[in-house]
């Protein structure tokens, strides 16, 4: 790595970085129930054209890792970079850290003529041009997945919430299944694929579900059942460990957390924290009422599978399937918030949870991308510019319009 870049990073710490590094120094040690962390994946793109970067140097990732205090890393494809926050008990701290991480990674990328884009599909990237990261782990995955892995030019957001009792963790995962489509709708940021409008607000999962062991979790009733499943696959040589279970939600291999993996990466930091806070408050509600898992059976999971598709297709405009008939996303969200409001108050994140109503009313990143596309006369360059600005903006994009319907 160029020592001049390291020296600049040593001497050029922003006030944000100084404060965050100090505050986060013991963040991983002060772990309490319902603490949480957020992981985000971004595309690396040419700073001038915003075309996706196909090959990226190791030096960039070393510099980003240094600049963020060890919180930025490579992903499976060279076009991607991932960041992970510290463990947090305060949504406001998580928001500030995400803003810091995005700015630091964007600043480092700028030293290499690149920038970052927080969206789950790059509007103009062609998956055939993707290049895997040259690491043994990724080489083994590509050998197994072949074209499906190459097509995985996708970025997501993962949210971990600590739930210390392992058995209750599985009850929460089961009870959470009907709610997963709501998180998909709120976070949708992938309406374009290979320079085409897909007609879906959240195309990412349509491509991601080509991979094995994806989709909604199975209806396991206990940790021993899940362990039997994992053991069968590992003993048969299907996967090296349970980190290769890529469901929309899964128990973490390394931490006492339940990981939500369904959301697209939110272009707005405030949206990301809102979605994470909604998940955190809902996880607390379900953890304290483990009997709610008993109400989720085959019918409920089958309905959730349909609603997952509808959330991908329509985003915040979705009419969800319910046994009593169709229900709007706003109605579903209102019911959720009514149930979890005491938990959001206990976690001091009610304001962040309430923001989800704004997203549902005015739209997610997908709606803003589609608006930029329509207003520019169908120019994907306008979409890319909107994403670039909104990714590292210090202020929230204006919420002034109704959601935009994808092309039929």
From Swiss-Prot:
It comes from Bradyrhizobium sp. (strain BTAi1 / ATCC BAA-1182). InterPro entries: GCL_type2/YbdK_subfam, GCS2, Gln_synth/guanido_kin_cat_dom, YbdK. One of its GO terms (molecular function) is glutamate-cysteine ligase activity. One of its GO terms (biological process) is modified amino acid biosynthetic process. It comes from the Bacteria. Transmembrane segments: none annotated. Belongs to the glutamate--cysteine ligase type 2 family. YbdK subfamily. ATP-dependent carboxylate-amine ligase which exhibits weak glutamate--cysteine ligase activity. It is an enzyme of class 6 (ligase). Gene3D superfamilies: 3.30.590.20. This is Putative glutamate--cysteine ligase 2. The lineage of its organism: Bacteria, Pseudomonadati, Pseudomonadota, Alphaproteobacteria, Hyphomicrobiales. Pfam families: GCS2. Its EC number is 6.3.2.2. Keywords: ATP-binding, Ligase, Nucleotide-binding. It catalyses: L-cysteine + L-glutamate + ATP = gamma-L-glutamyl-L-cysteine + ADP + phosphate + H(+).
